[in-house]
C-alpha cells in the first residue's frame, strides 16, 4: 500500500442511501421492477433523486407503510402480498421484482426474504421475486447496486466454461466497446452482470474470471467468489492507465500474448492521450477536493492526479474496502489524505480552508459551494455517464474541466463588461 | 400499504424543513437516518438556493440502534447549537426515527438551553408535507408567542385610526417550495402599499424569530396560503383577536374581493373607482379582446393543491370563459372546499393521491387544456393535450428567474399568458380552422402542442405501451367499431376537437345501439349533440 494517510471521521453525513441505485438499475433492466417497502420519505427520495418526472410508468415504486401497517407484522405481510399482486396484475411485463428494504421496514423488521420466498411460490416461476436492502441505516448510495446484484447471484446458472465476466452496471455503448476490445484480444466468452434483461443471467463457475467495473461491489464480489469465480485484482477502468491495467489483468489471466495486448491497446492509448491533452492543460496543477458519495472517489482521484496532473487535497469516501481498493491505493501519491466516513460540517470547513479549484460532491451541497465561489462537480453524474474505458478517458476529463472552463468564461465576461 | 409511483407531497418533516429553511435564525435538528439528507437538494437544486437548509441530520445507522441513540441525538443538538447559534431550535424526527421513539424534542428541552426549543411531532405514517409545514409554523408561532399578553377582547382592527398611523397587516403562509411564493409576496405587498396598508411581518418566508414575536403588533392577518397558515391564523384570532382574510387574491375577481375584504376588516373605505373599473390587470381586456374568441367554452381540467385549484376554477370559469370539465386536489385538508366548488360547476371533485387516477379522469373528460402539477403535465403530454402548471410539487421549471407571481394584478397577467399560450394563439387557431383543408394544415402540421403535433390520443393509442393496453382493455367488448370510412371522416375534424367528437360519436352510437360507425353516424351524432 502506498503512503496514503487514512483517517476515519464520524458525524452528520450528507450521502444518498442505497435506494438511489434504483435510479440507474431500473434503466439497465427494463423487465425488472423495484418495489421499495418503505415510507413516504422513500418515495419522495427516489422521485427527487430521479429528478425529472419523465417516465410514463416508472419501473420503480413504493409500498408506503401506513399507521395500520405498523400495528402488527402479520398485517404488513398481507398488505405487501396485496400490493405485489396489484402491481403484477397491472404490469404483466415484469419478470423480476425486487423487494427493496428501507429504514422503516428494517426497523420494524419486515422479513422481506420470507416475503420474497412466499411470493415466489405463489407466482410459480412467472415472476422472480428477490429482495435486498437499500436502507440508509445499512447502505450508502451505490451500495444498493451491490445489494441488488448479490441477490441475483444464487440464481446464476453454474458453468465450467472459461469466461470473463464484467460486473457492475455500465452504459450499454461502453460495455459493447469493452467487449469488442476483449474479443480483439482473443477473449471470446465475455458476459456482463447485471444483464440487460433480468431473465438472462450469465453463468458462473470456477473458470469464471471476474473484472469489477465499479468499486462498490464488495458483497457481490464475495458471493461470486463463493461460487468459485476468481476476482481479478486491478484498478478500475477509469482513465487510460486504469483501463489499460484493468484490461491487462484479464489478458494475463487468459494468457493473451503481451505483444497482442500492446498492439491492440497502443493505438487506442495514443488516440486517447491526444484527446486528453486540452483537458490536461486545463486541469493540471489545479487543486481537487472530493467529498464522499459514490465510492468512485478514489479511482477518480487517481485518474485526475496521474493523468491530468491535479493536486489532491482530500479524498473522501463513505467507506473503504482496503482489499478491493488496494490496486488503486498503490497508484496514489504518498501522503494523500483519504478520509473514510464523514462529518459534513468539518469537511466543509476544510474545503473552505484549503480553497480547492474543484470540489466533487453530492447534489445537496453543490449550489451552496458554488455560491461560496467554488467550482463543483456532482458525484452522481459519474454513475450515469459513460466514463469507463480508454476511449472514454477524455470524456471523463472533460466532465471535470467543464466547471473550470465555465468559471473562466463567466468571469472573463464580467471583466470585459465592466 | 399504499402503492405509489410518483407522489404529490413529501412526508411531514419536509414541510418542517420548508418552514425552517424559509426563516432566518432558526435551526432544525432532524433525527433521521442517512439518506434523508436528500431533502437538501430540494432547496439547493430545485429552488436553486445558495445556502444549505439550516438542518442538522443525526444520520444514525443500524449499528447505532443497539447503543444509545438518545446520546447521539443530544450530541448533534449540542454541535448544532454551538455551530449555528440559532435564535430558535426546531427538533423533530423523520419516519424511521419516529419508530425508535427517542423523543428528541424532550431530550433537547432537558439540555438547559436559553433559546426557545420547539418540539415537533409530525406523524410520518398518517400525515404529509403541507400538513407538516402548517403544524411546524403553528407550533413555532405558538411557542414564540406563548409569553405575549393575550388580548383577544381588546383587539380592534381599526385602532390605527385613533393611533394616527397607517394600518398594518401580516402576510402569513409564503414559504420555500411553495408555488411562486417569492413573487406573490412582492405583488401583494405592492398592492397593499398602493392602498396605504403597511406590512408588519411576512412569515415564514424571510422572517426571524424576533419578527414572529412582534406578529401581534398587526391590525389583521392575511392568510396567503391556507395550506400553510390557516391553523396559525385561527390561533392568532382566538388568542389575540386578529381577524384574517379568507380570500386568496389569485385572479382579477379574487383580487378585488380580497381588497374589499381587507378594507372591511381594517375599517377602511375602498376607493370608488377601484371598485368600478375593477381591474388594473390586463387579463380582463385581453380576455374580452376579439382574439380571445377562440377561448370560448374551451374545456379545461384542473388538478393541484387546494388553493391553486380553487383559484384556477374561478378564473377559468368566470374570467376566461372556459368550461371546467374536471376539478380535483391532492390536498385532503382542502377537500371540502374543492368539493363545494366542483358542485357549483355541476362536477364531482376528484380527491386523490394517485396520479394515475388523475390521468384516467383527464382522459375521461377529454379536455382541451389541463391545468395541473408537473405530474399532469406529463400525463397531458402523453395524451397530446396542452397543459399549464399551476401548483406544486415543485420542479426547477416552477422557480423561474423572471418575476412571475400568481397573485394580484400582475399574477392575473401571468396567468393569462401561462394558460393561453399552451393553447394555440387566437388568430393562428382561427386561421387553421378556416384553412384546415389546405395542405399546410393537414395532419403533419406541427403545432405548439409538443412532439405529438396536436395529434391528440389518435397516435398515442397505437403506441405499444402498457399504458395503452390498459386503455384499450378497459373498453367494453361491445364498443362500436369505426369503419375505415368513419375513421377518415373523423380525421377531417380538426385535431383539437377530434377527441371529443370521437367520444361523443361513440356515446351516441351506443345510445342508439349502432355497432359500426361510418361517416353518417358521425354526422348524426354531431347533429344529435348540437340539437
UniProtKB/Swiss-Prot annotation, chain A:
Its EC number is 1.3.7.7. Component of the dark-operative protochlorophyllide reductase (DPOR) that uses Mg-ATP and reduced ferredoxin to reduce ring D of protochlorophyllide (Pchlide) to form chlorophyllide a (Chlide). This reaction is light-independent. The NB-protein (ChlN-ChlB) is the catalytic component of the complex. Belongs to the BchN/ChlN family. Disulfide bonds: none annotated. Its cofactor is [4Fe-4S] cluster. PANTHER family: LIGHT-INDEPENDENT PROTOCHLOROPHYLLIDE REDUCTASE SUBUNIT N. One of its GO terms (molecular function) is ATP binding. The keyword Nucleotide-binding applies. Pathway: Porphyrin-containing compound metabolism; chlorophyll biosynthesis (light-independent). One of its GO terms (biological process) is photosynthesis, dark reaction. Binds 1 [4Fe-4S] cluster per heterodimer. The cluster is bound at the heterodimer interface by residues from both subunits. The keyword Nucleotide-binding applies. Keywords: 4Fe-4S, ATP-binding, Chlorophyll biosynthesis, Iron, Iron-sulfur, Metal-binding, Nucleotide-binding, Oxidoreductase, Photosynthesis. It holds the Pfam family Oxidored_nitro. The gene is chlN. InterPro entries: LIPOR_BchN/ChlN, Nase/OxRdtase_comp1, Protochl_reductN. It comes from Prochlorococcus marinus (strain MIT 9211). [4Fe-4S] cluster binds at residues 17, 42, 103. This is Light-independent protochlorophyllide reductase subunit N. It catalyses: chlorophyllide a + oxidized 2[4Fe-4S]-[ferredoxin] + 2 ADP + 2 phosphate = protochlorophyllide a + reduced 2[4Fe-4S]-[ferredoxin] + 2 ATP + 2 H2O. Protochlorophyllide reductase is composed of three subunits; ChlL, ChlN and ChlB. Forms a heterotetramer of two ChlB and two ChlN subunits.
Swiss-Prot record, chain B:
NCBIfam families: DPOR_BchB, PRK02910.1-4. [4Fe-4S] cluster binds at residue 36. Binds 1 [4Fe-4S] cluster per heterodimer. The cluster is bound at the heterodimer interface by residues from both subunits. It catalyses: chlorophyllide a + oxidized 2[4Fe-4S]-[ferredoxin] + 2 ADP + 2 phosphate = protochlorophyllide a + reduced 2[4Fe-4S]-[ferredoxin] + 2 ATP + 2 H2O. Pfam families: Oxidored_nitro (PF00148), PCP_red (PF08369). GO terms for biological process: light-independent chlorophyll biosynthetic process; photosynthesis, dark reaction. Its cofactor is [4Fe-4S] cluster. InterPro entries: ChlB/BchB/BchZ (IPR050152), LI-POR_suB-like_C (IPR013580), Nase/OxRdtase_comp1 (IPR000510), P-CP_red_C (IPR042298), Protochl_reductB (IPR005969), Protochlorophyllide_Rdtase (IPR016209). One of its GO terms (molecular function) is 4 iron, 4 sulfur cluster binding. The active site is at residue 291. Substrate binds at residues 426-427. Keywords: 4Fe-4S, ATP-binding, Chlorophyll biosynthesis, Iron, Iron-sulfur, Metal-binding, Nucleotide-binding, Oxidoreductase, Photosynthesis. This is Light-independent protochlorophyllide reductase subunit B. HAMAP family: ChlB_BchB (MF_00353). It comes from Prochlorococcus marinus (strain MIT 9211). Transmembrane segments: none annotated. Pathway: Porphyrin-containing compound metabolism; chlorophyll biosynthesis (light-independent). Component of the dark-operative protochlorophyllide reductase (DPOR) that uses Mg-ATP and reduced ferredoxin to reduce ring D of protochlorophyllide (Pchlide) to form chlorophyllide a (Chlide). This reaction is light-independent. The NB-protein (ChlN-ChlB) is the catalytic component of the complex. Its EC number is 1.3.7.7. Protochlorophyllide reductase is composed of three subunits; ChlL, ChlN and ChlB. Forms a heterotetramer of two ChlB and two ChlN subunits. Belongs to the ChlB/BchB/BchZ family.
Amino acid at each position: 500500500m502506498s503512503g496514503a494517510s487514512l483517517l476515519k471521521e464520524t458525524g452528520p453525513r450528507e450521502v444518498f442511501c442505497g435506494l438511489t441505485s434504483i435510479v440507474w438499475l431500473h434503466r439497465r433492466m427494463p423487465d425488472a421492477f423495484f418495489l421499495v417497502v418503505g415510507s413516504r420519505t422513500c418515495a419522495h427520495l427516489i422521485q427527487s433523486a430521479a429528478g425529472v418526472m419523465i417516465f410514463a410508468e416508472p419501473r420503480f415504486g413504493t409500498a408506503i407503510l401506513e399507521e395500520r401497517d405498523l400495528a402488527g407484522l402479520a398485517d404488513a405481510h398481507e398488505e405487501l402480498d396485496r400490493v405485489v399482486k396489484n402491481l403484477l396484475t397491472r404490469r404483466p411485463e415484469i419478470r423480476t421484482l425486487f423487494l427493496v428494504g428501507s429504514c422503516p421496514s428494517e426497523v420494524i423488521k419486515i422479513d422481506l426474504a420470507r416475503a420474497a420466498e412466499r411470493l415466489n411460490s405463489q407466482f410459480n416461476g412467472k415472476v422472480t421475486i428477490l429482495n435486498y436492502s437499500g436502507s440508509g441505516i445499512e447502505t450508502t448510495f451505490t451500495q444498493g447496486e451491490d445489494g441488488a446484484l448479490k441477490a441475483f447471484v444464487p440464481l446464476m446458472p453454474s458453468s465450467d466454461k472459461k469466461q470473463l465476466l464484467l460486473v457492475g452496471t455500465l452504459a450499454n455503448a461502453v460495455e459493447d466497446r469493452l467487449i469488442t476490445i476483449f474479443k480483439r484480444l482473443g477473449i471470446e466468452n465475455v458476459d456482463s452482470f447485471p444483464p440487460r434483461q433480468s431473465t438472462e443471467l450469465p453463468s458462473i463457475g470456477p473458470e469464471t474470471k471476474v473484472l469489477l467495473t465499479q468499486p462498490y461491489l464488495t458483497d457481490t464480489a464475495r458471493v461470486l467468489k463463493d461460487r468459485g469465480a476468481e476476482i481479478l485484482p486491478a484498478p478500475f477502468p477509469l482513465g487510460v492507465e486504469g483501463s489499460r491495467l484493468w484490461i491487462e489483468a484479464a489478458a494475463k489471466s487468459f494468457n493473451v500474448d503481451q505483444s497482442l495486448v500492446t498492439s491492440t491497446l497502443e493505438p487506442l492509448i495514443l488516440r486517447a492521450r491526444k484527446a486528453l491533452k486540452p483537458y490536461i492543460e486545463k486541469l493540471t496543477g489545479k487543486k481537487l477536493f472530493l467529498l464522499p458519495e459514490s465510492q468512485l472517489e478514489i479511482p477518480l482521484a487517481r485518474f485526475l492526479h496521474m493523468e491530468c496532473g491535479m493536486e489532491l487535497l482530500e479524498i473522501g469516501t463513505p467507506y473503504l474496502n482496503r482489499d478491493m481498493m488496494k490496486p488503486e491505493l498503490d497508484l496514489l501519491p504518498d501522503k494523500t489524505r483519504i478520509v473514510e466516513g464523514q462529518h459534513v460540517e468539518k469537511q466543509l470547513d476544510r474545503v473552505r480552508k484549503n480553497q480547492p479549484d474543484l470540489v466533487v460532491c453530492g447534489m445537496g451541497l453543490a449550489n451552496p459551494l458554488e455560491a461560496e465561489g467554488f467550482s463543483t462537480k456532482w458525484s452522481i453524474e459519474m454513475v450515469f455517464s459513460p466514463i469507463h474505458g480508454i476511449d472514454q478517458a477524455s470524456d471523463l476529463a472533460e466532465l471535470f474541466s467543464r466547471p473550470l472552463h465555465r468559471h473562466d468564461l463567466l468571469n472573463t465576461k464580467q471583466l470585459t463588461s465592466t | 400499504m399504499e402503492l405509489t409511483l410518483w407522489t404529490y407531497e413529501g412526508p411531514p418533516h419536509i414541510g418542517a424543513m420548508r418552514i425552517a429553511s424559509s426563516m432566518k435564525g432558526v435551526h432544525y435538528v432532524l433525527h433521521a437516518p442517512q439518506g434523508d439528507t436528500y431533502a437538501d437538494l430540494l432547496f439547493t437544486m430545485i429552488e436553486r438556493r445558495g445556502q444549505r437548509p439550516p438542518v442538522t441530520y443525526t444520520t444514525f445507522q443500524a449499528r447505532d440502534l443497539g447503543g444509545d441513540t438518545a446520546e447521539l441525538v443530544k450530541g448533534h443538538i449540542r454541535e448544532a447549537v454551538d455551530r449555528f447559534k440559532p435564535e430558535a431550535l426546531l427538533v423533530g424526527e423523520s419516519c424511521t426515527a419516529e419508530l425508535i421513539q427517542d423523543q428528541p424534542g424532550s431530550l433537547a428541552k432537558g439540555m438547559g438551553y436559553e433559546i426557545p426549543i420547539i418540539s415537533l411531532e409530525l406523524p410520518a405514517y398518517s400525515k404529509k408535507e403541507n400538513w407538516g409545514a402548517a403544524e411546524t409554523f403553528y407550533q413555532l408561532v405558538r411557542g414564540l408567542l406563548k409569553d405575549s399578553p393575550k388580548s383577544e377582547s381588546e383587539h380592534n382592527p381599526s385602532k390605527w385610526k385613533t393611533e394616527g398611523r397607517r394600518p398594518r397587516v401580516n402576510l402569513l403562509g409564503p414559504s420555500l417550495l411553495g408555488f411562486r411564493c417569492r413573487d406573490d409576496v412582492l405583488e401583494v405587498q405592492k398592492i397593499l402599499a398602493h392602498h396605504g396598508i403597511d406590512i408588519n411581518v411576512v412569515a415564514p418566508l424571510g422572517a426571524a424569530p424576533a419578527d414572529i414575536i412582534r406578529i401581534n403588533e398587526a391590525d389583521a392577518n392575511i392568510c396567503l396560503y391556507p395550506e400553510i397558515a390557516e391553523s396559525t391564523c385561527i390561533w392568532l384570532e382566538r388568542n389575540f383577536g386578529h381577524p384574517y382574510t379568507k380570500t386568496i387574491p389569485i385572479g382579477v375577481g379574487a383580487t378585488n374581493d380580497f381588497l374589499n375584504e381587507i378594507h372591511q376588516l381594517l375599517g377602511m373605505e375602498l376607493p370608488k373607482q377601484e371598485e368600478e373599473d375593477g381591474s388594473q390587470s390586463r387579463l380582463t381586456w385581453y380576455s374580452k379582446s376579439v382574439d380571445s374568441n377562440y377561448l370560448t367554452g374551451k374545456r379545461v381540467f384542473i388538478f393541484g393543491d387546494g388553493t391553486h385549484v380553487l383559484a384556477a376554477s374561478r378564473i377559468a370559469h368566470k374570467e376566461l370563459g372556459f368550461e371546467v370539465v374536471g376539478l380535483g386536489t391532492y390536498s385532503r385538508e382542502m377537500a371540502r372546499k374543492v368539493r363545494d366548488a366542483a358542485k357549483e360547476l355541476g362536477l364531482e371533485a376528484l380527491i386523490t393521491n394517485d396520479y394515475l387516477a388523475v390521468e384516467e379522469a383527464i382522459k375521461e373528460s377529454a379536455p382541451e387544456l389541463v391545468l395541473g402539477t408537473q405530474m399532469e403535465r406529463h400525463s397531458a403530454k402523453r395524451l397530446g393535450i396542452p397543459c399549464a402548471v399551476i401548483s406544486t410539487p415543485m420542479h426547477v421549471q416552477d422557480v423561474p428567474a423572471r418575476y412571475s407571481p400568481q397573485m394580484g394584478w400582475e399574477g392575473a397577467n401571468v396567468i393569462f399568458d401561462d394558460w393561453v399560450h399552451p393553447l394555440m394563439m387566437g388568430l393562428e387557431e382561427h386561421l387553421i380552422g378556416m384553412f384546415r383543408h389546405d395542405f399546410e394544415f393537414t395532419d403533419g402540421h406541427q403545432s405548439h402542442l409538443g412532439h405529438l403535433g396536436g395529434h391528440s390520443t389518435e397516435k398515442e393509442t397505437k403506441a405499444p405501451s402498457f399504458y395503452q393496453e390498459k386503455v384499450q382493455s378497459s373498453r367494453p367488448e361491445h364498443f362500436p367499431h369505426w369503419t375505415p370510412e368513419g375513421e377518415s371522416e373523423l380525421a377531417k375534424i380538426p385535431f383539437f376537437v377530434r377527441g371529443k367528437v370521437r367520444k361523443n360519436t361513440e356515446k351516441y352510437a351506443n345510445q342508439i345501439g349502432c355497432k359500426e360507425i361510418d361517416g353518417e353516424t358521425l354526422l348524426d351524432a354531431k347533429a344529435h349533440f348540437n340539437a
